[in-house]
């Protein structure tokens, strides 16, 4: 990534960041088991007489994206920030792999305004800041090959001609329209500090929308012979608030400064499913 920042006229601060990231992960795992050890002191398959099995798993996935951030601060009073990501993942079909996730925030430090000077002194106000933000994120919480019909293999449970042959199993049902689960959050908050920053408080209220949740879709009939795949099948709305209060101070104890801090936090939230296949809903 590259970063640029510049201060001009003593009161204007500007920063910009632009970057690129790519992550690739390859996994190759091997496992073996055999039941009925002759002695637990020697845990080796050679000293077991029961059923045995061998497993192997190979997978590969990648994520590629670009990101940016722009900050502008005027006189430490007015703060603006914008962010964005454009990400793609191999976990989704080619036509649905990429998504853009923007975010932004604004803040106003009211306590730094000139008309607040007398008020700050009279009540011991050190900082009062109002802020608001909007943010979007993407979730790719599905299997590496969830959109592809893959066949698995393994030894069957029956013995034929003195051994357990290997079988190849038919693929299950897949969704060919998988894409990013999008989470959008709108937040508003207040930060407060008093008494030489010994007492501080913070309050946030937020509404979060989760769209295209990656979950199982409508239940398929049992005669279909396969379980339902994960799709972008549901939407969720969450509303909540968070409040924190903190007191920190110090005093002399045995000729040494003793620092302490007390913090109280309260929070509440409620979530509602706003979209999901439910034929029994009235």
Model feature map: region roles:
Residues 1-282:
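Extracellular/periplasmic, surface-exposed regions of secreted and cell-surface proteins
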